[in-house]
Amino acid sequence: MAAKDVKFSGDARDRMLRGVDILANAVKVTLGPKGRNVVIEKSFGAPRITKDGVTVAKEIELEDKFENMGAQMLREVASKTNDLAGDGTTTATVLAQAIVREGAKAVAAGMNPMDLKRGIDTAVAAVIKDIEKRAKPVASSAEVAQVGTISANGDAAIGKMIAQAMQKVGNEGVITVEENKSLETEVDIVEGMKFDRGYLSPYFVTNAEKMTAELDDVYVLLHEKKLSGLQAMLPVLEAVVQSGRPLLIIAEDVEGEALATLVVNRLRGGLKVAAVKAPGFGDRRKAMLEDIAILTGGQLISDDLGMKLENVTIKMLGRAKKVVIDKENTTIVNGAGKKADIEARVGQIKAQIEETTSDYDREKLQERLAKLAGGVAVIRVGGATEVEVKEKKDRVEDALNATRAAVQEGIVPGGGVALLRAKKAVGRITNPNSDVQAGINIVLKALEAPMRQIAENAGVEGSIVVGKILEEKSETFGFDAQTEDYVDMVAKGIIDPAKVVRTALQDASSVAGLLVTTEAMVAELPKDAAPAMPAGGGMGGMGGMGF
């Protein structure tokens, strides 16, 4: 086991605080509408330029092991906030730095670290209650756009795009962000259920120009197993022919005689039909087939349910307004399933998402949820260079996460105003223990930090801005760093999701509380470089060999 270096009390806290300051100072320059960019060197390719706090935090690794421990603890704040709320990472970092700094001073003055932490926790609980009380639900698409715009660093086009995507696919729908090959940033919305299986034969194509099979007002037959012969299906096929409607068959596979017969029927015009393989594998395939059955109002023909193909009637088939199938994908639009059944299924999938511990399973369940609940939107981010596209993509992802958070828990005035106004709630708390009270006062002071930083990044004195806002009675009065004016933040559309503000403070105080109560630090001693091998002197005693 390697020897360890141990630091205690003041020395440990000083080294740790240096690490905290290095990381926080690099991250906090990005805060607010006039925040600057940070350039990050990459081991290959062009450097990365970003204004995303967590991206900066993740890149910082310090040489001194004790300083690095402080920096890594602070990095944890940014990562945790990003995981839970998807935005607010810079705010969380600024809050954590403020709490750690004041906490370290208090400990150096001889206060009890555990009592300080109790005070910090008490104050944070009061702030969170205050934020939850002030939060207003998101009422309109315009408010969604405003949240997106603020989080995308004042880019109104991104805010509008996200609002448009959310309006189309609903709050449960999936919105993904991809890089575009062109200069433009655009939204591509897929309504209905889309899955990654195309037609089994090009003979099913109805639109030769686009090479797609388009079926209107279509019946959907869902079968769990392979179809190799159509004998058992003849009664239901005849019923479909008589109805004059097209048919989509979704099964594990359609092969041999069954596929040949369907193709011949399609070419002769007897039955307008298309066949695709079922999406997914194993248990997931069965679950997705059941989703399609509920969406289209049909039944899954499954051996588990004791159903045989020969007993299938036309009433057991699902129905949809339109189905579009290309070489690789199938999209079912406007299934005829009952709304109550779809909602029940959505509730069931949500419960599974809550219970699962696997990130992969959670992602797949969320995809299924989106396909049932609304649809999928893809925001394709364009730009002139790869560096620009990556920087813009960071901002779009932040904005998307912020708008989702706003829909979940509502909105509060932005620009650090919500935290500043929460000082009133903290100011009402008193504790007879002076050390606990000192912990409460640490949070009281830290609540000003985000607003000060936003102002300072805009080139304005932070303490003057904070003082002027606290003098005003209006709860929504704040400082617009973009125009350097004092405005009504909500009326101006400068709003933050309550969830982002709450999560930032919770995560910051949690890690900062641990740093304040640290009394010793242990790190591995650097290993001495091994001595170099002596230079080879050749073989001795070869002089008398006549060479």
UniProtKB/Swiss-Prot annotation:
Q: Which reaction does it catalyse?
A: ATP + H2O + a folded polypeptide = ADP + phosphate + an unfolded polypeptide
Keyword check for Chaperone, yes or no.
yes
The alphabetical list of record keywords is: ATP-binding, Chaperone, Cytoplasm, Isomerase, Nucleotide-binding
Q: Give the binding site residues for ATP.
A: T30, L31, G32, P33, K51, D87, G88, T89, T90, T91, G415, D496
What are the disulfide bonds? none
Name the SUPFAM superfamilies on file. Answer: GroEL apical domain-like, GroEL equatorial domain-like, GroEL-intermediate domain like
Localization, per the record, is:
Cytoplasm
Instruction: Please report a single Pfam family linked to this protein.
Output: Cpn60_TCP1
Q: Which PROSITE patterns match?
A: CHAPERONINS_CPN60
Q: Which GO terms describe its molecular function?
A: ATP binding; ATP-dependent protein folding chaperone; isomerase activity; unfolded protein binding
The record's listing under InterPro entries reads: Chaperonin_Cpn60_CS, Cpn60/GroEL, Cpn60/GroEL/TCP-1, GroEL-like_apical_dom_sf, GROEL-like_equatorial_sf, TCP-1-like_intermed_sf
Question: Which GO BP annotation is one of this protein's?
Answer: protein refolding
Task: Show the GO cellular component annotation of the record.
Answer: cytoplasm
Which leading EC class covers this enzyme?
isomerase
EC number(s) recorded for this UniProt protein: 5.6.1.7
Its principal location?
cytoplasm
Family indicated by similarity: Belongs to the chaperonin (HSP60) family.
Tell me, in a sentence or two, what this protein's role is: Together with its co-chaperonin GroES, plays an essential role in assisting protein folding. The GroEL-GroES system forms a nano-cage that allows encapsulation of the non-native substrate proteins and provides a physical environment optimized to promote and accelerate protein folding.
Q: Which HAMAP family match?
A: CH60 (MF_00600)
How this chain assembles, per its entry, is:
Forms a cylinder of 14 subunits composed of two heptameric rings stacked back-to-back. Interacts with the co-chaperonin GroES.
Q: Give the protein name, as stated in the record.
A: Chaperonin GroEL 3
Q: Which organism is it from?
A: Bradyrhizobium sp. (strain ORS 278)
The encoding gene is groEL3
